[in-house]
């Protein structure tokens, strides 16, 4: 069987071209490590004066079972996430951060941003009932 996954970000206009290339190249390279070729394509789905969202879609074989499929997806996600951060995109986009993107949050927000997020979590969720650990790990 095949998997189809979309990885998305947003960036300002001067970065869009390099971002498209970086996401597609990272995805191809990650799946090549598993001996897999991928069909990938990118479109700009939300366009604004300041920049655009960048959606890259990857179609690839899931491999010989669940473990192989998960390993391929994790490689793809890690490579594309690293490329997003390296090229100045946002890992949050319109879907939020959550567990899948939390590892890149500090790289995007910096120490001050992470302190602000931690303060908001403490203020608005003092009892730790709202998705504890999703953004800040053990610090929540």
Where are the language model's segments positioned?
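Conserved glycine-rich FAD pyrophosphate-binding loop
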Residues: 1-140
């Amino acid at each position: 069987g095949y998997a189809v996954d979309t990885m998305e970000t947003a960036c300002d206009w001067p970065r869009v071209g390099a971002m498209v290339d970086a996401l597609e190249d990272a995805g191809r390279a990650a799946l090549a490590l598993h001996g897999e070729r991928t069909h990938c394509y990118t479109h700009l789905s939300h366009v604004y004066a300041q920049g655009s969202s960048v959606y890259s879609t990857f179609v690839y074989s899931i491999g010989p079972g669940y473990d192989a499929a998960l390993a391929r997806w994790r490689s793809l996600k890690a490579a594309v996430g690293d490329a997003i951060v390296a090229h100045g995109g946002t890992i949050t986009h319109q879907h939020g951060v959550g567990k899948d993107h939390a590892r890149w949050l500090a790289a995007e927000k910096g120490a001050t941003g992470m302190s602000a997020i931690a303060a908001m979590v403490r203020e608005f969720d003092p009892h730790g009932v709202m998705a504890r650990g999703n953004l800040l790990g053990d610090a929540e």
